Amino acid sequence: CLGIGRFPIRTVEQATQMVDKVISYMENKNTGSWKNNLCFMADDGSNTDGFMTEHMEFADQLAGYVESEHPEFLVNKLYYDAYKKDMTAGTYPDVRSGLQKLLKDGLLLFNYTGHGGTTALSDEKVLTQTDINQFTYTHLPVWVTATCDFTRFDDLNTSAGEDVFLNKSSGGIALFTTVRVAYSRPNFPINDNVIRNLFERNNGRRRTLGEVMQATKNTLSSVYKLGFCLIGDPAVKMAYPEFGMKVTTVNGQSVDGNSISFKALEKITVEGEVLDASGQLVTDFTGIVNPTVKDSKVTVTCLKNSNKDDSPNTIFIGNDSVRNGKFSFTFTVPKDISYSNLQGKMNLYAVDTESGNEAQGNFDNFIVGGTSDTAETDTIGPEIRALYLNDTTFVDGGQVNTTPYFVAELWDKSGVNITGSSVGHDMMLVIDESTVLSYNLNSYYELLPGEDGTGIVKFPIPALEPGKHTAEFWVWDILNNSTVRTFTFEVVEGLKPFLFDVIATPGIAREQVTFHLMHNRPESRMRVGIMVYDLAGRQLWKHEESGTSGLFEN
């Protein structure tokens, strides 16, 4: 078997766009801790289709392999059966929104096991072709879809899988995918081999996607492998970091051979190193480290009485500096931990801000439990330094569009609570005192680099009815002191965006120019038209573009 990839293009314009997309991915300009994140999604089953929990069990085996053999990655599990189904709409809204957020935040790999077709994943339409064509996220995952017909490239109609690849700036960089009807049990060994070959190195180097496909098919004799194909450039390698990372000390104590506990309200200082493939310190690595510390695993009982082990509760997400290959960061363990005295997990990512070289690692030689004897006293809740919708000119009672963008800037000397492990201590936005319009913002909070105790939460509010609304924003610190801010606003349907400024760079251009439009519609679907005129009023250029706007930050 040869490592062949396919570009399902029909026009010269598509060919140009896909080549540019591949070049951009290979140049590795989009660095970030998203490269440590993977998602395994599994369909549910029923007595009528004969699968029951089979899709979830297969996905969990794949996730378990990565967690065991490649613990430097963070595995996100979206198993339908662990979520409540909307029986009226026939879908899983929390799975749907969870997948959209994971894709937006960034995934290195998205893997799906279950039913599917040419226009959607699963009968519940958790992901549809319409969704795919509206993708605007810039972190490009590799997709693996163990389903039916998702990428039927030889049909006159363009399939959903093709659109994942053909999205010129979003979607995915490549797909290991099916072109015909497939079956769950024969699909699993194909999916399993793809995952193993993606992450296992060949003589110390990452395999190209073509080599992954070749190695996968050459180890299988099943005729069902003929229905799997690679959509994308076979010369591309999945863009996970090359360097490794290790923790050397916790609170000045060597991690080798010592028992380490993370106790509630204890201040923890972690030190470590960036290492090359031979285990040597990379002395010229200087940049940023992004640690994520997770509480102990919990067992989630699903609706059909099967279980999954997951790590939904976060102790700390932060950032600090790396200098000459060595890093250090400090945080305080929240009061709301599991107290399980079971193993936790620390995930590490770092990037050299000069060279763009990346590193990743993990540390799990610690347990989570107990309470510190030296905890500091703090009875004051977090300070809400700024709170607004869409932009900083917002005033209480102001008018906004139907999908306003909520922003709050926070500070707390001890730290903001985002653990999600205790009822009543989540960061929440509650609109009109409605449970339907109540949003958990824990995962939308991020610490600001170089700002001790300062962070920001940014959340795109789903569509609201026109009229006046009241909202409450609740936030807690890690000692469970709370702060609440109440504000009002009026939703006006059809409210026009306000354009603050248009900046062209460079100011004097001969060949090309980039236009930056500053407006008050962050994270909104927009259609933008730009016309360029000379001093005599003659139109020189005209362009229209549709997409989702970014968030302008001073």
Regions found by a protein language model. Name each.
Residues C1-N319, R323-T332, S340-L342, L348-A350, ...:
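Cysteine-dependent hydrolase recognition
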Residues C39-F40, D256-N290, Y388, T392-M427, ...:
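Contiguous beta-strand segments within globular domains
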Residues M245, T377-L387, H469, P497-F498:
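Proline-centered linker/hinge motifs at extracellular inter-domain junctions
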Residues E490-D534, E545-S546:
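Glycine-centered coil/turn sites that cap beta-strands in beta-rich domains
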Residues Q539-N554:
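Glycine-centered tight-turn motifs at strand-turn-strand junctions
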